[in-house]
Amino acid sequence: MARFFRRRKFCRFTAEGVKEIDYKDLNTLKAYVSETGKIVPSRITGTKAKYQRQLATAIKRARYLALLPYTDSHGR
């Protein structure tokens, strides 16, 4: 049987030296939200726990301020 190569996950925020995740940075936040509007877990993205917590808080703030949708757009 052939074993498939799994790409090593790494924390993008640690690599870039990000201190804090901003809720106004929508391009970054959209990368961590699934098509259905759910926050993608760290076991899939490889984000460290510290940044995953900041990410979740930032996404929730952006949703509350209507910068990000809570769910996908219905009726398409």
Curated annotation (Swiss-Prot):
GO cellular component, one term: cytosolic small ribosomal subunit
PROSITE patterns tied to this protein: RIBOSOMAL_S18 (PS00057)
Pfam families: Ribosomal_S18
GO molecular function: small ribosomal subunit rRNA binding; structural constituent of ribosome
Keywords from the named record: Ribonucleoprotein, Ribosomal protein, RNA-binding, rRNA-binding
GO BP terms, alphabetized: translation
Matching InterPro entries: Ribosomal_bS18, Ribosomal_bS18_CS, Ribosomal_bS18_sf
Function: Binds as a heterodimer with protein bS6 to the central domain of the 16S rRNA, where it helps stabilize the platform of the 30S subunit.
Subunit organization: Part of the 30S ribosomal subunit. Forms a tight heterodimer with protein bS6.
Sequence similarity: Belongs to the bacterial ribosomal protein bS18 family.
UniProt cross-references to HAMAP family, sorted A to Z: Ribosomal_bS18
Protein name: Small ribosomal subunit protein bS18
Organism field: Pseudomonas aeruginosa (strain ATCC 15692 / DSM 22644 / CIP 104116 / JCM 14847 / LMG 12228 / 1C / PRS 101 / PAO1)
Gene name tied to this protein: rpsR
